[in-house]
């Protein structure tokens, strides 16, 4: 399907370009969001008449997006989630979740603006882009942790999963050492008992003799 773009679309073209796209992409995204028109003679004539106005409006929207983006660009947002010891989440964090928490900061963001290829399923710091406008993107960090304390440790650069694994190994080593010591003590006591019993038996034999 041939369309004329009304704004820049990433990996497709800029305002005024006539492009060929799949019908589904046109009907489900470009046309309903007002990013393009069907490239008919009537629409092309209409576009040329309104081109200057469209370009001015697009520049204004880009400026507004850039201004609002200053409040979140480079910021970190904490999300507390349940997860196993391996760091795997019980569930996932989606673009909708991210849009909601970022919007709480005062900058309105919708899920379609979140550049996320797949839901996030692990703890940690996840850097991603938010496309506030075709010409304006900002970068944020999503800090997913099991507690506020863990989030602060991650923000400070600590690998909490590796730290937890080290702690678990240290505990396991300590428990193994305790068991080994207990086993050695048990063997010593058994040896002492055996020696005592042998000595008693020798004394008994001497008495009988």
Swiss-Prot record:
GO terms for cellular component: ribonucleoprotein complex; ribosome. Residues 181-209 are annotated as: Disordered. GO terms for molecular function: rRNA binding; structural constituent of ribosome. Residues 197-209 have a biased composition (Acidic residues). GO terms for biological process: translation. It holds the Pfam family Ribosomal_L9_N. Keywords: Ribonucleoprotein, Ribosomal protein, RNA-binding, rRNA-binding. Binds to the 23S rRNA. PANTHER family: 50S RIBOSOMAL PROTEIN L9. Belongs to the bacterial ribosomal protein bL9 family. This is Large ribosomal subunit protein bL9.
